[in-house]
Design a protein with these regions (language model features):
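Active-site-flanking beta-strand signature of metal-NTP-handling nucleotidyl enzymes
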Residues: 35-38
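Long, contiguous binding/interaction regions
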Residues: 1-31, 41-76, 80-149, 153-178
């Protein structure tokens, strides 16, 4: 286990010599028509596709072709800021200076700053320079519509598949419309 952990850390830091990694996007449907986008970073495309396909199959889903679910999501930068850290007017002024696209204020505890993926690093760096504490900052696949699953057993099936995919060392992130 120690070797696996060290290898995973080196892989994440890009410190493994002579190994080239590629980013790949897999798409498919989970149980109950939940759309999934799986982002991977791998040094072995064949191993990873087999692992992802196995997880989809075992989890009651189907691995789809390229662009089979991507059209249901918007790619965007998302930065989360605690409301207690700054007032809305101050944050709005900062994000306009930084070049962000929008701010969502519906959550009672957090603001969500939205950027284009191309401008994400600039906005994040600008907010860091202004010493604004960010709880999260990442480029995400945001679903245009969410699938509501009322039945807890059905929801558990979806969560189980997402967890199986997430447990794969090559998987960077899993996005769903659930």
């Amino acid at each position: 286990p120690k070797d696996n952990i060290e290898r995973a850390v080196k892989k994440g830091a890009g410190e493994m010599d002579g190994v080239s990694y590629e980013e790949i996007l897999y798409e498919g449907y989970g149980p109950h028509n939940v759309a999934l986008i799986v982002e991977v970073l791998t040094d072995n495309r064949n191993r990873t596709i087999a692992s992802v396909r196995h997880a989809f199959s075992k989890g009651g889903g189907n691995l789809g072709s390229s662009n089979s679910v991507q059209y249901m999501f918007d790619r965007m930068g998302s930065i989360t800021v605690r409301k207690a850290a700054i007032d809305e007017d101050q944050l709005t002024e900062l994000i306009l200076e930084a070049g962000a696209d929008d701010i969502y204020t519906q959550d009672p505890n957090f603001y969500q700053v939205i950027t284009s993926p191309a401008n994400f690093d600039n906005v994040r760096s600008y907010l860091e320079e202004k010493e604004l504490e960010m709880l999260s900052a990442e480029v995400i696949w945001n679903p245009q519509n969410r699938v509501e699953i009322e039945d807890s057993k059905k929801a558990e099936q979806v969560i189980k598949l997402i967890d199986m995919l997430d447990d794969d060392d090559d998987v960077k992130s899993v996005h769903s419309n659930f």
